[in-house]
Amino acid sequence: MILNEIYAAADALGLVIVGGQALDVGIGGYIIAGGHSQLGVLYGMAADQMLEATIVTPSGQILTINACQNSDYFYAFRGGGGSTFGVLVDVTVKTYPTPPVTMLTLEILASTADDTFFEQMAYIMSQYPYLSNYSISGYPYIYPIYPTSATTTIAVYEAVFLLHDGTSGAAMTGIFEPIIKYISITWPGTYLVNSTTEYPTFYAHFQANHDTSAAGTDQVLGSRLLSPEVLTGNFTALTEAVKGFTGNLGTSGAAPFLLGGKGVKDAVPQGGSDAVLPAWRTSLVHMSEFDNHGSRR
């Protein structure tokens, strides 16, 4: 099944599962690959949610895997990589009461991706540990060169942040107020806009904001996991790292996703552990770049 179908079925019962933002991602590949989620800050990675599964091994065996039987397969199928150990036929995962969701969108526009722009990007990232303390997650994007016409470009930062406890839009704005105030004072004249929207359930948010990216594009991808210490240590070094990571991407971009936090760090998978990359447990950010084919030269 795909995530949209599972979200809909769970929502009808007042429940939610840990899943992603795309309509048509299959639950099997998502879990086997680890599966980060905006709900991870509360409940952990998708792989941490598996309770049991049925698989077909390369030799044709049909096995039930869980913490008590075929535990080696059970470990490997939770984050060990898709199509590596066999085919996932069905899976049982944890569910949770669906939370109301407050969404804050934040956008910064600049005429060019100069030093000020990258300092602003680094500053926002340096505040991720503060936001994570409120169990906030988010999908930000950085576009150093964003075409607005055939001949003109701007630099763009756009982000969607979620709070999953029913906090009002006004309260969410209050959490971000010191961040926005600092940007406005430190870099006067910054074009910054933000707004909040409240949703009664996670699925209601998903229906309105799911990923609509087209399939079939050519991209070169790269990523790093960043810990809170990296984000809050040397600001100059962080700024240079963000600039180096994103500054030569042409009309491509980067995504400093805020998807770690307490839920990922403190997750207790069935059997005590799983195959999720251990660095996820101490990271807040999945920083990825997506270089559109042919965008640099």
Annotate the PLM regions.
Residues M1-R297:
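Soluble FAD-dependent oxygen oxidases
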